[in-house]
Amino acid sequence: MSAHTRTTRKTVTAIRSTKGIGSLVSLTAYSAPMAKLVDEVADVIIVGDSVGMVLYGMPDTLRVTLDMMIAHGAAVVRGAAQACVVVDLPFSTYQESPAQAYRSAARLLAETGAQGVKLEGGTEMADAIRFLTERGIPVMAHVGLMPQQANATGGFRAQGMDPRSAAQVFDAACSAEQAGAFSVVIEGTAEALARHITETLTIPTIGIGASPACDGQVLVTEDMIGAFDAYTPRFVKRYADANAVMRDAIRQYAHDVRQGVFPEPAHCFGYGKPLQLVGAADAAA
């Protein structure tokens, strides 16, 4: 492949420069095949710690480990050629101190090849965000409904629905920008609040259950295509029923095997040709 035809991956600088220009498309991916599909349209692929719930059947994201995120992040980077890949820092790998956050983030980027990390929090994580960005690690912040903090906030509930909560979310987003974040994910907040944050910040906001006014949107891909039906958030729009398609294919396969119609000759090697064994007579003797 020549230098003129080589695909150029989007950088965090390019993503940041899109503020106010069009809408960023973002989706999640946890594997190389899914990343390859999403990469055809996405500006940003987020390797979310939601992998624990979507792929591993966990009840929440708290059990996801850094090793898991590194394995899935590396797979996504291998599968995606042009999107900016951002990988979540999982629970308990960054909250203790800026130094802990740096160790986790540095290892994650070094072992995956991703372009940035995402962490939950703004105001309380400002020191960590600043510590990372000053040392060359791009950070995407996450405010509003923060799944890693669901136990402390009363579950998966919309945030910013009253003046006090709204002020806290707004301050968190502003703190994240001031600390050096290149983008902010706003999840599960009052629409007017997400709109106000977007109008205030000079970095792109990416909404998930937030506002159409955000600079971009993200959904969990399996939610969007109907491949995960354990729970469907209110803010998800389903564009397909992938589970139904896969279920039909699996049932058809089982039927064909039980009826003896699979495999067909086209699926076999040398079907119908007589068996020839060199040295078979000698072996029998």
From Swiss-Prot:
Cofactor(s) the record lists: Mg(2+)
Presence of the UniProt keyword Thylakoid in the record: no
Binding residue positions for Mg(2+): 49, 88, 120
InterPro entries tied to this protein: Pantoate_hydroxy_MeTrfase (IPR003700), Pyrv/PenolPyrv_kinase-like_dom (IPR015813), Pyrv_kinase-like_dom_sf (IPR040442)
Catalytic activity: 3-methyl-2-oxobutanoate + (6R)-5,10-methylene-5,6,7,8-tetrahydrofolate + H2O = 2-dehydropantoate + (6S)-5,6,7,8-tetrahydrofolate
Annotated signal peptide: none
Gene Ontology molecular function: any one: 3-methyl-2-oxobutanoate hydroxymethyltransferase activity
Chain positions recorded as 3-methyl-2-oxobutanoate binding sites: 49-50, 88, 118
Record bears the keyword Phosphoprotein: no
UniProt source species: Burkholderia lata (strain ATCC 17760 / DSM 23089 / LMG 22485 / NCIMB 9086 / R18194 / 383)
Cofactor-binding details, from the entry: Binds 1 Mg(2+) ion per subunit.
CDD domains: KPHMT-like
Subcellular location: Cytoplasm
Keywords annotated in UniProt: Cytoplasm, Magnesium, Metal-binding, Pantothenate biosynthesis, Transferase
Pathway: Cofactor biosynthesis; (R)-pantothenate biosynthesis; (R)-pantoate from 3-methyl-2-oxobutanoate: step 1/2
Subunit structure: Homodecamer; pentamer of dimers.
Highest taxon in the source lineage: Bacteria
Protein name from the UniProt record: 3-methyl-2-oxobutanoate hydroxymethyltransferase 1
